[in-house]
Amino acid sequence: MDKVALVTGITGQDGSYLAELLISKGYTVVGTVRATISSDDERFKNLSAVINSKNLIIESCDLCDYGAMDRIIRKYKPKEVYNLAAQSDVGESFKTPLATCSMNMLGVVNLLEVVRNSDPDIRMYQASTSEMFGDNTTTPQNEDTLFSPVSPYGVAKLAAHYMVRSYRSSYNMFAASGILFN
């Protein structure tokens, strides 16, 4: 396996599109899914274009499980990690703020720690969100716009965004965030 990428949240819209792109470029893609998702789950339909590819490996894993994430990274030795996993329903984040913060913030810190402790040369991408801007009406919005999240989802993603920045500067890691807009 020459070019290996780990894509968390591979059954989501962005994860499945990214998997298709990477496979078309000759990568082996290791995708993680929550342990509660079975292969006949509706979300696997997003991967229909590549589900039978010999270059796609699916692993069941909780982003907050350090041991499981460490095992996957040490087993497949990816050089690139794309974290697209999240509890992404803003409305749901008001109903389940603890679970949202655990997945969307602590899960990211966990992944950063696994990368730092296993292979600090891994290039890591964190999917941030326009929800970090919250009720800020400035247009256009970019990384210099004031953050003002109003939902548990936005707050957790902002904390993760800042953790990526902290790890990049504190540990000299290649860790980058991209702010996604829908």
Task: Locate predicted features.
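N-terminal Rossmann-like NAD(P)+-binding domain of SDR-like oxidoreductases, especially those catalyzing
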Residues: 1-181
